Amino acid sequence: MVNKREIGTAYEKRAGAYLEQHGYKVIEYNFRSRQGEIDIIAKDGEYLAFVEVKYRADSHAGNPFEAVNRSKQRTISKVASYYCLTHGYGMDTPCRFDVVAVLGEKIELIQTAFEYQM
């Protein structure tokens, strides 16, 4: 039996491959800090992209983008700040928050899905 973690990892890898096909360079998967986790950290040109991956088997469970609520955005923002601080990225590094939604077999990317949340 496959657990949720294994399913999530599989879709994160699939999302990473999708991002790379669209010019991103994946730096890291599943970066964790005490504040939480970011699914994918990647470079897209000059941008450091913090990417949340959401999967739904079908639309009955709702739109995957809806799962990235304000609370989740705050968590991702805090972890992104910690990542930049601990990996030598300064205040001048352009960053953004993207979301990859997987609905069944369809993958959709929203760049700059949300702004930094305090």
Regions of interest found by a model, annotated:
Residues 85-118:
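Domain-level recognition of nuclease-like catalytic cores that cleave nucleotide substrates
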Residues 38-62, 76:
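Conserved catalytic cores of phosphodiester-cleaving nucleases, focusing on short active-site segments
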Residues 33-36:
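Short acidic/glycine-enriched loop/turn segments that link adjacent beta-strands
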Residues 1-29:
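Acidic-basic catalytic patches of nuclease active cores, encompassing PD-(D/E)XK
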Residues 19, 76, 97:
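Residue-level signal for inorganic ion chemistry
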Residues 60-92:
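Mid-chain, well-packed structural core segment of small domains
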Residues 26-28, 50, 97:
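Hydrophobic residues on conserved beta-strands that form the core of alpha/beta folds
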